[in-house]
Amino acid sequence: MARPILLLLILLALPALRPACAEVPEHGAPTHGIAMNAGVTHGIAMHGDLALPPDFTAFPYVDPAARKGGTIRQAVTGSFDSLHPHIVKGVPALGLGHVFETLLTRSWDEPFSLYGLLADRVEVAGDRSAVTFRINANARWHDGTPVTAADVLFSLEMQRRHGTPNRRLFYAKVAAAEAPDPQTVRFAFASNADGTIDREMPLLMGLMPIHSKAFWEGRDFNRTTLEPIMGSGPYRIATVDPGRRIVYERVRDYWGRDLPTRLGQFNADRLEFDYYRDDSVALEAFKAGQGDVRYESDPAKWATGYDGPARRDGRIVREELPNRRPEPARGLIFNTRRPIFADLRVRRALGMATDFDWIGRSLFHGLLTRTASYYPNSDLAARGLPEGEELRALEPFRDRLPPELFIRPFTLPDGGTGSGPAGLRANRREALRLLEQAGWRVRDGRLTDAAGNRFAFEILLSDPSEERVALEFTRSLEPLGIDARVRTVDSAQFQGRLDRLEFDMTMRWWASSLSPGNEQLYYYGSEAAGQEGSRNLAGIRDPVVDALARSIAVATTRAELIGRVRALDRVLLWGHYMVPLFHSPVDRIARRSTLHRPVNTPLYGPMLESWWVAP
């Protein structure tokens, strides 16, 4: 089942650094001859040591004796038109991650550590310039054929050519790849312009989705498809009703069922996803017994939407489960490619006009926390004044950053958050002053530029439940003479417009793990700003942001990493690229009483893969 945490592993590649021989050779062809000088081990930790020993039997947050059987159903919103999750085209169905596998898999109880899956051994060069994986001799595709190094090399080449932009970018860092035998594959990595090596690259290769080379013979990898694609994972697709429903069945002879990284997981015989256009309808379907579990992101629904016989008699159980992961940084994101949002003063002004305290109380029942970081709910968030490792990361750019960044903590506007209407009025006066500095004036109740063009823009949404906040935001801009309108489209249109960067403002988020890395360049880097399908929705083009984001991937200690992430966070906050909204410090989950979970909850929060069905 798909986790609600969006953990994208992405980096900005430097194609100019790729040598002429960087293309993946045919299986068995010679390459540079990749030197290795580190010991063979059972996994990789981004920083420090692995928490689990080589002989561990299961992750600590699962129940190895969990009951097998039953069905887990989810009522979800949206639609889908593809069963191929690893290309740009199409909207893939939920749950496909359980069909495909990777060489290594994450422990969700560590910031960023990987253990064996398709590969049972890994050897990393001391400077992380190369990595070797040994493929598990038992690894099998769903047709019973073995997973081989040829499949891995094929997958790399397909991702380089046709993968999502983030994957194309970081797989371009592979300078050489070779398969000395059917169970071994080696990768060497290009260095950065300053000679450093992206220390995350061995882990990113471990997380590359592996496809069957034989399956794709005669098929176009770069086309959306509703034909089930053969995988090696614990589930296969059973039935598909395009856009409406998809059902997965557990692979009875799944090759990896007894692996330490799989034991106690994927317990249901069937996973069913029923799609609804509206989340309120999906909630009613869940309450009516057409779903077994629901992650609730809407505090209003959590506060008032679950009452009914099933909850009162105990058939529905609601839980608030704490987690220690960064929550998604959700906000109203400015598309700074649009001329009206190119000026920082304009972006700052628009963030000062809304009474978010009222929104938090009235719309969210006081259950959410206002977001004031790109890494909220974690020790990665900038706080106070920069010091230590963070200050060291910022110092080289002091002359290119606002002086206030070093002497004043970043704070959200106070108006409406305890200072009452007077504070909000003061903020709006300051907002008008900033807009006037940027060349805008209120004339006859309309904010216009010198040529008489009105300040007008559209907020693009895909979920009707988001309209409440967006409409309140637009109303708060009316006293400034701004014409802001909300447009809600279906999920396919929404994703298409985001991919093509055809929007003024949108309500979206950036999600990070406890070990941010190369994906930060894809979220905020200059090169990603102009790429179709980019996650740099804001269109950020700032050399300081580029340098800080790039430095994160080469941090050698946890302390260095935290300091550099905090530095990036602080620079992004002072750039006012979004109007921050809210986040929840807990996971709110409603489930059927017949759906059970392990006693231990991992660092990143509850993992539905480890739950089971029992009377």
Predicted regions and their residues:
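Aromatic- and charge-enriched surface segment that lines or borders ligand/interaction sites
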Residues: 52, 62, 67, 87-95, ...
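Surface-exposed binding/hinge segments that line
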Residues: 134, 169-216, 232-241, 386-400
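N-terminal lobe/hinge region of extracytoplasmic solute-binding protein
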Residues: 38-127, 134, 157, 161, ...
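A structural "hinge/loop" feature
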Residues: 58, 78-94, 118, 145, ...
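Ligand-site clamp/hinge motif
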Residues: 136, 223, 254-307, 348, ...
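Extracellular/periplasmic solute-recognition and catalytic clefts
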Residues: 176-177, 238-249, 274-338, 345-349, ...
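Gly/Pro-rich hinge or "lid" segments in bacterial periplasmic/extracellular proteins
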Residues: 79, 99-112, 157, 204-265, ...
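Detector for C-terminal structural segments
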Residues: 76-78, 91-94, 241-246, 250, ...
